[in-house]
Amino acid sequence: MIITFEGGDQAGKKTQSAMLQRKLRSAKLKTKLFSFPDYTTPIGKEIDRYLHGKRKYPAQVIHCLLAANRWERASDLQDAKEKNSVIIMNRYRESNLVYGITNGLKLDWLEKLDEGLPKSDLVIVLDVPQKESFARKKQNRDKFEKNKQFSYKISQGYRKLA
């Protein structure tokens, strides 16, 4: 089973993912937690450079990189599935859809980037008011986190997704 937590920046996805993992493990269930983007991989490091202004890419390129980052971990996802683990995702495919559409890209093009990756069985969208999410992180914001108007559009996109 794949359970994904989605939502805008600073919505609590990381916190909720960790809490669910602890709860499931206390019930003696096998779990595996993934966070995307995964900044530990080569492509993830390039995404981090982009998000912090060290690289510039057109929207199509960054969304290809975000999808490639998920593909980098595809074998790990498959291993976790084969071990009957509950897979918990802090962001996954849906983030690329919402952010990509907000960046002016077409839904069908974005969906094709992840074709073949396992789909989530349950997607939980965390909806936090923009004012609160901005209050949660005041420093070291990335490219998307700094832009209040973009953040508002992302929130609207997740509401449509839900």
Features from the language model and the residues they span:
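ATP-dependent small-molecule kinase phosphotransfer cores
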Residues: 29-115
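Hydrophobic alpha-helical packing residues
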Residues: 20, 24-25
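Hydrophobic anchor at the beta1->P-loop junction of P-loop NTPases
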Residues: 3-5
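P-loop (Walker A) phosphate-binding loop of NTP-binding proteins
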Residues: 8
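The start of beta-strands in P-loop NTPase/AAA+ ATPase cores
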Residues: 1, 85-86, 122
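A glycine- and Lys/Arg-enriched "phosphate-lid" helix/loop adjacent to the NTP-binding pocket
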Residues: 96-157
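Walker A/P-loop
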Residues: 14
